[in-house]
Amino acid sequence: MSTFFAKANAVERKWYVIDAAGLPLGRLATEAARILRGKHKPTFTPNVDTGDHVIIINAEKVVLTGNKLDQKMYRRHSGYPGGLKETPYRKLMQNMPERAVEHAVKGMLPHNKLGAQMYTKLKVYRDENHPHQAQQPEVWTIQ
């Protein structure tokens, strides 16, 4: 019996919705990245995008353990001397809670073109409203 290799055009993609209310950020991001990569499927192939679409709702209700709410910083650099910008997690959650979840999930995907392609299938929303009802997403529960 030969090894199975998935074909990119033969992959059937489903839509899953994850409710982030009360979930730790890391556990939510790990599970979302797992679905985006397709590791939950028996047809997983590392060099092919076999993953499904993920909708994360209630991003503003995600939690961090310990003192990370005050100590965790998001950093970016403009490339110029002295161009380091730091944003505390608490401020980011007040202004753009979707960005914190997207950043965590993106860090758990491959850092190449395939990872960028997987990242496009992630949709994050601040509250429980999302415009993807037509795709009939299944609810994915995280213990």
From Swiss-Prot:
Gene3D superfamilies associated with the record:
Ribosomal protein L13 (3.90.1180.10)
Which Pfam families would you find in this protein's record?
Ribosomal_L13 (PF00572)
Signal sequence region: none
Q: Which GO terms describe its cellular component?
A: cytosolic large ribosomal subunit
One GO biological process term is:
translation
Q: Does the keyword Ribonucleoprotein apply?
A: yes
Q: Which CDD domains match?
A: Ribosomal_L13 (cd00392)
Q: Which UniProt keywords apply?
A: Ribonucleoprotein, Ribosomal protein
Q: Care to name a GO molecular-function term for this sequence? A: mRNA binding
Its function, per the record, reads: This protein is one of the early assembly proteins of the 50S ribosomal subunit, although it is not seen to bind rRNA by itself. It is important during the early stages of 50S assembly.
Q: Which family does it belong to?
A: Belongs to the universal ribosomal protein uL13 family.
Report quaternary structure and partners.
Part of the 50S ribosomal subunit.
Protein name, UniProt field: Large ribosomal subunit protein uL13
**Which organism's genome codes for this protein?**
Desulfitobacterium hafniense (strain DSM 10664 / DCB-2)
